[in-house]
Amino acid sequence: MCQNGAQGSFRGAPPLSKEDVIEMEGTVLENLPNAMFKVELENKHSLLCHISGRMRKNYIRILPGDKVTVQLTPYDLTKGRISYRHK
């Protein structure tokens, strides 16, 4: 229980809101172990990405050559999360 009117504290960085996430489009170059993918963005930068939880839950398969939407955080622009596979 909190004492002296102190609020609960959190560890690490505060959670990101949707406004803090950078969304970009790219193409999957190759599959890597542990559900990781190498993705090349439209601006020719290469990223290491993992699948979002909803895509994993719905068994959405991602293959090399697929167009995807990638979410990046401003803290680490070398890693991302694949949030959508375009048809």
From Swiss-Prot:
Predominant location of this chain?
Answer: cytoplasm
Compartments annotated for it: namely: Cytoplasm
Please name every pair of cysteines joined by a disulfide bond in this record. Answer: none
Q: What interactions and quaternary structure are annotated? A: Component of the 30S ribosomal translation pre-initiation complex which assembles on the 30S ribosome in the order IF-2 and IF-3, IF-1 and N-formylmethionyl-tRNA(fMet); mRNA recruitment can occur at any time during PIC assembly.
What family does the entry list? Belongs to the IF-1 family.
Instruction: Offer an example of a GO molecular function term for this protein.
Output: rRNA binding
Record keywords: RNA-binding included?
Answer: yes
Q: What is this protein called?
A: Translation initiation factor IF-1
Gene Ontology CC annotation, any one: cytosol
Entry function: One of the essential components for the initiation of protein synthesis. Stabilizes the binding of IF-2 and IF-3 on the 30S subunit to which N-formylmethionyl-tRNA(fMet) subsequently binds. Helps modulate mRNA selection, yielding the 30S pre-initiation complex (PIC). Upon addition of the 50S ribosomal subunit IF-1, IF-2 and IF-3 are released leaving the mature 70S translation initiation complex.
Cross-referenced InterPro entries, in alphabetical order?
Answer: NA-bd_OB-fold (IPR012340), RNA-binding_domain_S1_IF1 (IPR006196), S1_domain (IPR003029), TIF_IF1 (IPR004368)
Q: Which residues form the S1-like domain?
A: 16-87
Instruction: State the UniProt keywords alphabetically.
Output: Cytoplasm, Initiation factor, Protein biosynthesis, RNA-binding, rRNA-binding
- Give any Pfam family that matches: eIF-1a
**What domain of life?**
Bacteria
